[in-house]
């Protein structure tokens, strides 16, 4: 946490939020992201520091996503969705084509989270407009199946 203090100060002065990104390793683990946010908020008046959580970097937390989300929720700046299969097979997958994102999205909806939700395009083999449309169509299908649940 101390290593990013200059960035914490700079973003505070600019009036910007600072989002910690779960890009794998120790720093991408939900408990560690939360610990860094707590430390910065408690010891450096950094209420603007939070978490940008990307499902495509969260394959290791499919099974405990409900607990991870609950832990991170007070600090979330944004949640980015992705199709989800075990073992990141594949890592980037359109919404509605994975085995687990429907349950994860249902968990998000039931959690009371009301912050921003994003859809990213990390597919270099597909035009961004096409990739985003596919994700929006997949999200629509997932949500339609959850209407009465």
For the regions a language model picked out, list residue spans one by one:
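Histidine-acidic metal/acid-base catalytic patches
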Residues: 6-9, 13-15, 30-149
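Acceptor-substrate binding/catalytic loop of class I
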Residues: 25-26
